[in-house]
Regions:
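Auxiliary Fe-S-binding modules of radical SAM enzymes
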Residues: 47-55, 65-197
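Radical SAM/AdoMet-radical enzyme domain recognition
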Residues: 1-63
């Protein structure tokens, strides 16, 4: 609960855990929990998250930390790599590549003998920008072609037809990019919680 409050600054861990249970009880599937490991804060909880995946039969996805919300990108931002997460989990569990085919960024693993899964979203140690087909919709209505985009298109008030045209245009723009990794060319003053999937 202490780390939860340090990271989120709002809400209660117990409420989140009840929400996860409610989603499972309602038959929503798959239930996926995203977590960003922050060195010195919650990086000792990797196995706790793996245990959660096993105990609840859900997917826990580890996302490498990216510079957001005013992080100073002129300094190296520490993160926990995909390799470290795998090494730690394999101390307790056997992981089997899940072989799921999707347009998502995660590398998925089944925890052998359980319904639990682990996903790795390794934007820093194994960039996947050249494979990304996702757009992002911010909480204030801007459609972004990329997670690290500084500018987007305001779609609030547009008709469905206009939004469809904007989406098609952004996908054409993405297809023409020769982008190997996120640039994070300027410090984000936007919280990741305000950027949708």
């Amino acid at each position: 609960p202490v780390n939860f409050r340090k990271i989120t600054r709002v809400g209660e861990l117990a409420d989140v855990l009840r929400g996860i249970d409610a989603a499972i009880d309602a038959g929503l599937a798959p239930v996926k929990i995203n977590t960003v490991l922050i060195p010195g804060l919650n990086d000792q909880e990797i196995l706790n998250f793996a245990d959660l995946a096993v105990n609840k039969g859900i997917s826990v996805r580890f996302i490498e930390r990216m510079p957001f919300n005013g992080d100073d990108i002129t300094k190296p931002l520490e993160f926990i790599s995909e390799a470290k997460v795998l090494q730690t989990i394999k101390e307790k569990y056997e992981l089997v590549p899940a072989g799921e085919h999707s347009f998502g960024p995660a590398k998925n693993f089944q925890i052998r003998g359980t319904a639990g899964k682990i996903g790795l979203i390794s934007s820093r140690s194994a960039p996947f920008c050249h494979l990304c087909r996702r757009l992002r919709l911010t909480s204030n209505g801007f459609l972004l072609p990329c997670l690290d985009s500084q500018h987007g298109t305001n779609v609030r008030g547009m008709t469905d037809h206009e939004i469809k045209n904007v989406i098609a245009s952004l996908y054409r723009e993405k297809a023409s990019w020769q982008k190997n990794k996120a640039c994070f060319a300027a410090t984000f003053d936007r919280s990741l919680s305000k950027i949708g999937g």
